[in-house]
Amino acid sequence: MSSGKAFIGKPAPDFTATAVMPDGQFKDIKLSDYRGKYVVFFFYPLDFTFVCPTEIIAYSDRADEFKKINCEIIGASVDSHFCHLAWINTPKKQGGLGTMKIPLVSDTKRVIAKDYGVLKEDEGIAYRGLFIIDEKGILRQITINDLPVGRSVDETLRLVQAFQFTDKHGEVCPAGWKPGSDTIKPDVQKSKEYFSKQK
């Protein structure tokens, strides 16, 4: 795995790349075009594989939930945009993706995967990296899974909601926090209000 240029609390590495858009058209997109919104940017190893369609379809199916909280989802792999389109046009019952609500970026030169530190150099594919980027373009969260295990859309949504809550209110979110749950005031005395309610 390459070390990359992606660091928590720093600007996410910008990129320009060709993507297959939800309307099935090819378009060059830039990460910086999404400034003003949160972005969930995730890598997957390859098109026409086994775990990948389950993740991509899961994120696509729930894209509207993310849009409601001002967050866009972008997927990426080292495959060409032509390969992405062929996979989208393959029926789900045959391992395809079907109609997508999210763009799929083509990183054939592996530059983006290297910049984000997810390139599996010996195979030339990306690990399952997931990056949450805030509306200012700052990287807030990084997770990288080994190839055989998929990610949780619920956990991704929870994390975006938690970062947005802390951005807005200045309070911090404890383990397992969900919208509506108690938060902690980041102050030695005021935090006792939260801890006094614990069993």
From Swiss-Prot:
Residues 6-165 form the Thioredoxin domain. It is found in: Cytoplasm. Coiled coil: none annotated. The active site is at residue 52. Its main location: cytoplasm. PROSITE patterns: THIOREDOXIN_2. The enzyme can be inactivated by further oxidation of the cysteine sulfenic acid (C(P)-SOH) to sulphinic acid (C(P)-SO2H) instead of its condensation to a disulfide bond. It can be reactivated by forming a transient disulfide bond with sulfiredoxin SRXN1, which reduces the cysteine sulfinic acid in an ATP- and Mg-dependent manner. Changing residue 173 to S: Abolishes the ability to form a mixed-disulfide with GDPD5. GO terms for molecular function: thioredoxin peroxidase activity. This is Peroxiredoxin-1. Reduced levels of PRDX1 by RNAi cause the loss of motor neurons but did not alter the number of motor neuron progenitors or the dorsal-ventral pattering of spinal progenitors, and did not compromise motor neuron survival. GO terms for biological process: cell redox homeostasis; hydrogen peroxide catabolic process; leukocyte activation; removal of superoxide radicals; response to oxidative stress. GO terms for cellular component: cytosol. Belongs to the peroxiredoxin family. AhpC/Prx1 subfamily. InterPro entries: AhpC/TSA, Peroxiredoxin, Peroxiredoxin_AhpC-typ, Peroxiredoxin_C, Thioredoxin-like_sf, Thioredoxin_domain. The keyword Cytoplasm applies.
